[in-house]
Structures are given as structure tokens and as C-alpha cells.
Curated annotation (Swiss-Prot):
Family of the protein in this entry: Belongs to the UPF0434 family.
SUPFAM superfamilies hit by this protein: Trm112p-like
Matches recorded under Pfam families: Trm112p
GO cellular component: cytosol
Protein name per the record: UPF0434 protein Rpic_2808
Coiled-coil ranges from the UniProt annotation: none
Recorded superkingdom: Bacteria
Organism of this sequence: Ralstonia pickettii (strain 12J)
């Protein structure tokens, strides 16, 4: 994921920042507890496509 793109993208629901979870290939919104998938290098920023995250699950930013 390009860092410049990550700086621009926000959660479509709350407009909050997102964190890239490289291990699961997702963008995480900690406010709404949603994980948006990245498919073929393209973030899918649709609430219907997001999954609920588990509270306290660590995100691998590396």
C-alpha cells in the first residue's frame, strides 16, 4: 500500500484515519471497528464489504 494513498484515504463512515494491516491485507478503522479489504492492491472502501474487527486484536503495520 502506497503511504501517500494511505494518508488520503479515510473511513467512509466516520471519516477517521485508517491503519494498514499488512498481515491481513486490510485497512482498519479503530473508531468503527471495521476492516476494509484490499483486493489486487485496491482498497475496497465499501461499508458492505468491511468486516467487524475483534476488540483488542493487534494490527501488524510492518
Amino acid at each position: 500500500m502506497d503511504n501517500r494513498l494511505l494518508e488520503i484515504l479515510v473511513c467512509p463512515l466516520c471519516k477517521g484515519t485508517l491503519q494498514h494491516d499488512r498481515a491481513n491485507n486490510e485497512l482498519i478503522c479503530h473508531v468503527d471497528k471495521l476492516a476494509y479489504p484490499i483486493r489486487d492492491g485496491i482498497p475496497v472502501m465499501l461499508a458492505d464489504e468491511a468486516r467487524q474487527t475483534v476488540e483488542g486484536t493487534p494490527v501488524d503495520p510492518a
